[in-house]
């Protein structure tokens, strides 16, 4: 298991945890001094009170929580958001309210999931043409909706 150092940049921060044994993502909690109200169709930057040190070759992906999306239309507009291995600042979550009613975020609310994943850098090689496939350039629903 990969170890990821974490620092509470706010003493009230809640450490992320996996809700179940095989969960892919850890729940991230809001670290707030006072509640934040998300008006319909508005965004807010929500602090977690945590900073992490990912090893080289890893990223943290921030993703919406399905229950918040289903029940309240709360999501992350840039999902999945990426935390790079060389970032050392506080992990912040951009929330958006796609719903019709205000949504209140309180300290300790689980607001997102964090999935730590490996990645590889690639070297792009410019060529004159790409190899042909049966699919070709078909995309955006070309196989049906």
UniProtKB/Swiss-Prot annotation:
Which pathway features in its UniProt record?
A: Pyrimidine metabolism; dUMP biosynthesis; dUMP from dCTP (dUTP route): step 2/2
Would the keyword Cell wall biogenesis/degradation be found if you checked this record's keyword annotation? no
Keyword annotations: Hydrolase, Magnesium, Metal-binding, Nucleotide metabolism
- Indicate the secretion signal residues: none
Reactions it catalyzes: dUTP + H2O = dUMP + diphosphate + H(+)
Q: Per the entry, which co-factors are needed?
A: Mg(2+)
Q: Which residues form a coiled coil?
A: none
Which GO MF term does the entry hold, naming one?
Answer: dUTP diphosphatase activity
Gene3D superfamilies per the UniProt record, alphabetical: 2.70.40.10
Q: What's the top EC group for this one?
A: hydrolase
Q: What is one process in the GO biological process aspect for this record?
A: dUTP catabolic process
Residue numbers binding substrate = 65-67, 78, 82-84, 92
The EC code for this enzyme is 3.6.1.23
Top-level taxonomic group: Bacteria
Q: Which HAMAP family match?
A: dUTPase_bact
Purpose: This enzyme is involved in nucleotide metabolism: it produces dUMP, the immediate precursor of thymidine nucleotides and it decreases the intracellular concentration of dUTP so that uracil cannot be incorporated into DNA.
Q: Which NCBIfam families match?
A: dut, PRK00601.1
Q: Which family does it belong to?
A: Belongs to the dUTPase family.
Protein name in the entry:
Deoxyuridine 5'-triphosphate nucleotidohydrolase
Q: Which organism does this sequence originate in?
A: Chlorobium phaeobacteroides (strain BS1)
Task: Read off the lineage from the record.
Answer: Bacteria, Pseudomonadati, Chlorobiota, Chlorobiia, Chlorobiales
């Amino acid at each position: 298991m990969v170890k990821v150092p974490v620092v509470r940049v706010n003493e009230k921060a809640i450490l992320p945890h996996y809700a179940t044994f095989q969960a892919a993502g850890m729940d991230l909690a809001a670290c707030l001094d006072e509640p934040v109200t998300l008006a319909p169709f508005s965004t807010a930057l929500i602090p977690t009170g945590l900073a992490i040190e990912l090893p080289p070759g890893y990223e943290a992906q921030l993703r919406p929580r399905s229950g918040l999306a289903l029940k309240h239309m709360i999501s992350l507009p840039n999902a999945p958001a990426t935390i790079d291995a060389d970032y050392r600042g506080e992990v912040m979550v951009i929330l958006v309210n796609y719903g019709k009613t205000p949504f209140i975020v309180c300290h300790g609310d689980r607001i997102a999931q964090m999935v730590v994943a490996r990645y590889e850098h690639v070297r792009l090689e410019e060529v004159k043409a790409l190899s042909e496939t049966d699919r070709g350039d078909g995309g955006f629903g070309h196989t049906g909706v």
